[in-house]
Amino acid sequence: MINEIKKDAQTRMQKSLESLTHAFTRIRTGKAHPSILGGVMVPYYGADTPLSQVANVTVKDSRTLQVVAFERNMLAAVDKAIQSSGLGFNPTNLGELLLISMPALTEETRKGFTKQARDAAEDARVAVRNIRRDALSQLKDLVKEKEISEDEERRAADDVQKLTDKFVAEIEVAVKQKEADLMAV
């Protein structure tokens, strides 16, 4: 019973960390990377479809992405979707493909992206702490039902706290790395 609670908490904390990593891929650094366009949705036969399902996104050079639509007639829709995505990109349509130049990040935009990264990290920390709280309340319920002793509950609570500390430290490392990437010129 205790092991199941700890394993569930660990799994959920790992998912929070993965979610943070995924959120970080959406935050632009100065370098071109296909995952920046991961959230772009393109209208395709009446339904919004992820860009990756209607076009191939590759890195042409360190500051340029190349987008090739699987169907040539979709290029205009892909262009419009990228422009309206709120990412601040203005693709160049070359007829068969789109080129997206990554504008150099100004100090102001770097600070804004750093703030976004910190906010995402704080959300992940809160999620990890909520998972800890849920696990501790499950342990307390087991004590109330006399399924485990208070000593077992205390030991399990210490283990859950160690898990929490480990994942919060991993979140810290991830946000420091992202900040370093953002501030590198």
UniProtKB/Swiss-Prot annotation:
UniProt GO MF annotations: ribosomal large subunit binding
Domain of life: Bacteria
SS bond list: none
Signal sequence range: none
An example Gene Ontology CC term for this record: cytosol
Entry keyword set: Cytoplasm, Protein biosynthesis
Keyword Protein biosynthesis among record annotations: yes
Compartments, as annotated in UniProt: Cytoplasm
Gene Ontology terms describing biological process: cytoplasmic translational termination
Keyword field contains Nucleotide-binding: no
SUPFAM superfamilies given in the database record: Ribosome recycling factor, RRF
Principal cellular location given in the protein's record: cytoplasm
One family name in Pfam for this protein: RRF
Family: Belongs to the RRF family.
NCBIfam families for this protein: frr
Protein purpose: Responsible for the release of ribosomes from messenger RNA at the termination of protein biosynthesis. May increase the efficiency of translation by recycling ribosomes from one round of translation to another.
UniProt name for this protein: Ribosome-recycling factor
Gene: frr
